[in-house]
Amino acid sequence: MTASTLKTLSAQLAAKEVSAVELARHYLARIEARADLNAFIHVDPEATLAQAQAADARLAAGDAGPLAGIPIAHKDVFVTRGWRATAGSKMLDSYVSPFDATVVERLAAAGMVTLGKTNMDEFAMGSSNENSHFGPVKNPWDVARVPGGSSGGSAAAVAADLAPAATGTDTGGSIRQPASFSGITGIKPTYGRVSRYGMIAFASSLDQGGPMARTAEDCALLLSAMAGFDARDSTSLEPGRGGDAEDFGRLLGRPLEGADAARPLAGLRIGLPQEYFGAGLADDVRTAVRAALAELETLGATLVDISLPKTELSIPTYYVIAPAEASSNLSRFDGVRYGHRAAAYRDLADMYRKTRAEGFGWEVKRRILVGTYVLSHGYYDAYYLQAQKIRRIIAQDFQNAFGQCDVIMGPVAPTVAWKLGEKTDDPLQMYLADIFTLSTSLAGLPGMSVPAGFGANGLPVGLQIIGNYFEEARMLQIAHAFQQATDWHTRRPAA
């Protein structure tokens, strides 16, 4: 079962070579054996095995799809009925959700079995998974290093074979960057493709859920179950406008139109932003990404130099808009209705102050303060409105680029995973780690990370694929063709 893809597990379950209960027990044992990674915040073996038994009953009755009986881990930003939902924060340490997030609900309806809730940066604010109230997650490739964030627990769980797949969320790179650092595949779909209902909010105009797994084929299978219109989410794309049910794996294994099996990507124009290959890119990452691009040329693709001139403005733009939205979203955590409440206080105002001072970590407090500042009278026009204008310009830069190419590719991050504690005292250096992923999120475009080799100290490097709106199926087709020609996605860290 170790390092099995979802396709393999599905076939084994259908052939009765293994049961859902046996699979669940196997992965629960793996989670216990690798507790040192701190990838999970909460597991409930009794609940997991009950779900597995129900999946076995569906399989026996012939009432099951391709995901039935397969275990999955959920990032602890998705509320799950009867399970804790902490968002990695002391503020929600004891919160147990009375309902399922739409993502959880849809995957459960497909028959998937919840293994547990994965660790994450508090309220998804971070790039290293060191900001969790429950302690840092460790990278399975080197436990002295970060796995990336904020979906670091999900990435580490899949990389270390603690789960065959996991859910994640991406606000500024939080699926793609940990997927790159941990050597797995992950995709952030077009904004609005996947419902945010039941996903604890960070920045509502940026947050987007997506799958993390071993292969593009696995991600396509998961995204097909996760995506689609949801009336409970006001930002969900409507049917006819990107919200229709879709088989995201329908193009896998097929050459592009006009191409053939020998050169399946013939005719594909890959845009390479000059801003993604500048002086800030580490040599080892550059070498791995260039080698991956050379492989894509062998498959028939053509490389085209392009420019995304406002890339350098993505960090200041993001760190105005995202904190502004966070300061509003997190105002609900006040100790009154649910979550942490200070034990001793003089009056209501004192209770608010002490509850939030005790319940939030330093990075969350920093972003709340920044967000409150940029929304305050006298600064709203100077900062927030200007950031929104630049956001529209960044989105237009991408549309201009897509006039010259079909997809855009480059590194996911400037470096491989850094050591635990290396950047915690320098927030700016931490923020710079997201320079290649933020602009995609600001534009609402789909982006993914695909394993593309190794850099310094044998650490994984991811290749970023950015598509135009609603082109996830083509991105997955390209990623699958690359993975059929390479074996980077099959490499695993030592047990």
Swiss-Prot record:
Gene3D superfamilies: Amidase signature (AS) domain. It catalyses: L-glutamyl-tRNA(Gln) + L-glutamine + ATP + H2O = L-glutaminyl-tRNA(Gln) + L-glutamate + ADP + phosphate + H(+). The keyword Nucleotide-binding applies. GO terms for cellular component: glutamyl-tRNA(Gln) amidotransferase complex. GO terms for molecular function: ATP binding; glutaminyl-tRNA synthase (glutamine-hydrolyzing) activity. InterPro entries: Amidase (IPR000120), Amidase_CS (IPR020556), Amidase_dom (IPR023631), AS_sf (IPR036928), GatA (IPR004412). Keywords: ATP-binding, Ligase, Nucleotide-binding, Protein biosynthesis. One of its GO terms (biological process) is translation. The active site is at K75 (charge relay system), S150 (charge relay system), S174 (acyl-ester intermediate). Belongs to the amidase family. GatA subfamily. Heterotrimer of A, B and C subunits. Allows the formation of correctly charged Gln-tRNA(Gln) through the transamidation of misacylated Glu-tRNA(Gln) in organisms which lack glutaminyl-tRNA synthetase. The reaction takes place in the presence of glutamine and ATP through an activated gamma-phospho-Glu-tRNA(Gln). This is Glutamyl-tRNA(Gln) amidotransferase subunit A. It comes from Ralstonia nicotianae (strain ATCC BAA-1114 / GMI1000).
